[in-house]
Amino acid sequence: MKALSKLKAEEGIWMTDVPEPELGHNDLLIKIRKTAICGTDVHIYNWDEWSQKTIPVPMVVGHEYVGEVVGIGQEVKGFKIGDRVSGEGHITCGHCRNCRAGRTHLCRNTIGVGVNRPGCFAEYLVIPAFNAFKIPDNISDDLASIFDPFGNAVHTALSFDLVGEDVLVSGAGPIGIMAAAVAKHVGARNVVITDVNEYRLELARKMGITRAVNVAKENLEDVMAELGMTEGFDVGLEMSGAPAAFRTMLDTMNHGGRIAMLGIPPSDMSIDWTKVIFKGLFIKGIYGREMFETWYKMAALIQSGLDLSPIITHRFSIDDFQKGFDAMRSGQSGKVILSWD
């Protein structure tokens, strides 16, 4: 079958031909319709330090997708041929303390689809049926293909009660923009997103965010004053991994504020911890999605009117995958969809 693989320990992704995956007793065989390119896939393409330590070569990559069930393992219940599905990209062990307690998103033995085992950039994918999520009929293939990153946004945004709150989102990548849109949709008062990438800030404006701020040109405290905010942000969603952005967030949080961190900062990031202590801030780390509460919330948010369509900016045939990766690597894109039909 046709697949996009990391064939060499160097920059690039290559189209290749690989055997179809074998279906296990507890698995689903999924015919891929559409996939989306993730920031992780760009890291793998670039063959950065993380990728060199993590990714086996050769391997089919990718973990954002929607497809159709075409094969069902003999032990599987609850699915039928023709079901339209996406899937949780973190495959968990089922036997550690967190898994047994129902906190599978905190499994210490997680294996990543397209990271530690073959991924979805292929005509067919096999995953455990436990990881599959049926897509409601009124959600498009395009939106279903970005459920994985949308889940990161939803998990982060819904970590805290947002109704009537003032929310700061640092980092206007696709996940940050989606998190800001979720916050606005569920009843936050002011949602402010910051970045230095004007293209992506304009995407945020199209999503109806209260204020998209280019911190290279505007002062965040001036924006707060413009919005009538006198005591700081109630909730912070840190999506950038940029130390300067996190320090600004700490400066502008209200006392008792709550911060959810999805962005991955450098390991040696220094901050003024006295601000955390004396402001009484609560900081929560976010990884992946809650299984499967986040997935049901994603579907419900879209069905209740959340419009994510502006975040999808580029669509290509899989044969033009290089154009898709070029768009993602340029920083001048939202989500990029690759069609396998």
UniProtKB/Swiss-Prot annotation:
One Pfam family cited in the UniProt record for this chain: ADH_N
Cofactor: Zn(2+)
UniProt cross-references to InterPro entries, sorted A to Z: ADH-like_C, ADH-like_N, ADH_Zn_CS, GroES-like_sf, L-Threonine_3-DHase, NAD(P)-bd_dom_sf, PKS_ER, Zn_alcohol_dh
Site positions per UniProt: Important for catalytic activity for the proton relay mechanism but does not participate directly in the coordination of zinc atom: 148
Catalytic residues (positions): 40 (charge relay system), 43 (charge relay system)
Cofactor note: Binds 2 Zn(2+) ions per subunit.
Residues where NAD(+) binds: 175, 195, 200, 262-264, 286-287
PANTHER family on file: L-THREONINE 3-DEHYDROGENASE
HAMAP family, per the entry: Thr_dehydrog (MF_00627)
Protein's UniProt name: L-threonine 3-dehydrogenase
Gene that encodes the chain: tdh
